[in-house]
Amino acid sequence: MKIGVLALQGAVREHIRHIELSGYEGIAIKRVEQLDEIDGLILPGGESTTLRRLMDLYGFKEKLQQLDLPMFGTCAGLIVLAKNVENESGYLNKLDITVERNSFGRQVDSFESELDIKGIANDIEGVFIRAPHIAKVDNGVEILSKVGGKIVAVKQGQYLGVSFHPELTDDYRITKYFIEHMIKH
């Protein structure tokens, strides 16, 4: 089984490392044609506006909207998966959620927190860097974790989204969960 990581920006190598530690093949996705070779896709963090522009430029948006591909979005990747972002439309419209950008503050307000993530573990380390939070969930969306009352992890069908950066820690259990419960099922 091959798991792709969208390689337009973000911690691509770190995500691939987590895929490999989970026992699977990880590949950097740089061209739209590569999407046909994978079983699931991770959308990494970075800057969400830049990520959307690059996805438009290289033709990823249309292809990803058409494909029925399991996807896992971290930080900016979560924003890209959302149906609504603050007071604007979403991008890929895969998760029935509304996201608020940078809701934990600026870069200097970055922090780490131990998270209890339903169905995965109660001791996951979350790295929050200019992180969004999920302000609203619609029917069919399962809340997996909160920090300070703010929703930071959800799943819906074959889509998983988190506000933080699991790839910046040595703990690959979230990636393994995505592969083994949302792709292999």
UniProtKB/Swiss-Prot annotation:
Pfam families: SNO. The keyword Transferase does not apply. InterPro entries: Class_I_gatase-like, PdxT/SNO, PdxT/SNO_CS. Gene3D superfamilies: 3.40.50.880. One of its GO terms (biological process) is pyridoxine metabolic process. GO terms for cellular component: cytosol; glutaminase complex. Keywords: Glutamine amidotransferase, Hydrolase, Lyase, Pyridoxal phosphate. Pathway: Cofactor biosynthesis; pyridoxal 5'-phosphate biosynthesis. The active site is at C75, H165, E167. It catalyses: aldehydo-D-ribose 5-phosphate + D-glyceraldehyde 3-phosphate + L-glutamine = pyridoxal 5'-phosphate + L-glutamate + phosphate + 3 H2O + H(+); L-glutamine + H2O = L-glutamate + NH4(+). L-glutamine binds at G46, E47, S48, R101, I129, R130. The keyword Secreted does not apply. GO terms for molecular function: glutaminase activity; pyridoxal 5'-phosphate synthase (glutamine hydrolysing) activity. Its EC number is 4.3.3.6, 3.5.1.2. CDD domains: GATase1_PB. Belongs to the glutaminase PdxT/SNO family. Catalyzes the hydrolysis of glutamine to glutamate and ammonia as part of the biosynthesis of pyridoxal 5'-phosphate. The resulting ammonia molecule is channeled to the active site of PdxS. HAMAP family: PdxT. In the presence of PdxS, forms a dodecamer of heterodimers. Only shows activity in the heterodimer. This is Pyridoxal 5'-phosphate synthase subunit PdxT.
